[in-house]
Swiss-Prot record:
It is found in: Cellular thylakoid membrane. Its main location: membrane. Disulfide bonds: none annotated. One of its GO terms (cellular component) is plasma membrane-derived thylakoid membrane. The gene is psb30. This is Photosystem II reaction center protein Psb30. Residues 1-6 are lumenal. Signal peptide: none annotated. Keywords: Membrane, Photosynthesis, Photosystem II, Thylakoid, Transmembrane, Transmembrane helix.
Amino acid sequence: EVIAQLTMIAMIGIAGPMIIFLLAVRRGNL
């Protein structure tokens, strides 16, 4: 369904930056 696809895209769009942020915090780049 279109709704399912939009939900997956939204989750990836939100999770992507969060994962990058967490990795940056662990490495101490901030």
